[in-house]
């Protein structure tokens, strides 16, 4: 667990001895699959770091449709905005698989920052990366067609969750077809058509809730 926590954005650049001392103050928590960790609009004063499993972060549109912002896995942190902004949660966090995590509340984090000012710098870097990713996603929605967005999401999931399998890359995403569509920002039918086309070209192979990427180079060219 310590190795996973050391990779979390909040701890990067912090001395290992300090990390070991700080992590002892974290509260472990386990969630079943399909559990809502927190919902959009709820008050919040706690952040979470994933030890194992996957969590989807999403928002609900005025017409009731859900849009997924990102998929998070081991060493990823979520819910940190509520630590600095006392307003309601801006998104919902729901487990895709069984999840083991650790959490801390606002008072604990402020105490950490007072003792270790470098933690605040790491948090700013995490938030800056999130903002950059959001800007990139908005640009993709405007300038990139659906197949291009599907290709890009597959590569991003591969970078985060992929494992080598022979000469291919297996991506166990644990998502339904509808969730993949929500992540891409398109209809399920359009996303399925793009996936079927990629499979027909021999770039990928679809296997339940995983994808075997056999030609990442062509997929990357399609994502541009």
From Swiss-Prot:
User: What InterPro entries does the record tag this protein with?
Assistant: cNMP-bd_dom, cNMP-bd_dom_sf, Env_Response_Regulators, HTH_CRP, RmlC-like_jellyroll, WH-like_DNA-bd_sf, WH_DNA-bd_sf
What are the record keywords, sorted?
Activator, cAMP, cAMP-binding, DNA-binding, Nucleotide-binding, Repressor, Transcription, Transcription regulation, Virulence
GO molecular function, a single term: DNA-binding transcription factor activity
Is Metal-binding one of the keywords UniProt gives this record?
A: no
Q: What residues are annotated to bind DNA?
A: 177-196
* Keyword Transcription regulation belongs to the record: yes
Can you cite a GO biological process for this protein? regulation of DNA-templated transcription
Intrachain S-S bonds: none
What residue ranges are annotated as transmembrane?
none
Coiled coil residues, start to end: none
Source domain of life is Bacteria
Location of the HTH crp-type domain: 144-217
Phenotype of the disruptant? Grows more slowly in aerobic liquid culture and on plates, severely impaired growth in unactivated mouse bone marrow-derived macrophages and in infected mice.
Offer a single GO CC term for the protein.
plasma membrane
Would you tell me the protein name for this molecule? CRP-like cAMP-activated global transcriptional regulator
User: Native species of this protein?
Assistant: Mycobacterium tuberculosis (strain ATCC 25618 / H37Rv)
Q: Which gene encodes it?
A: crp
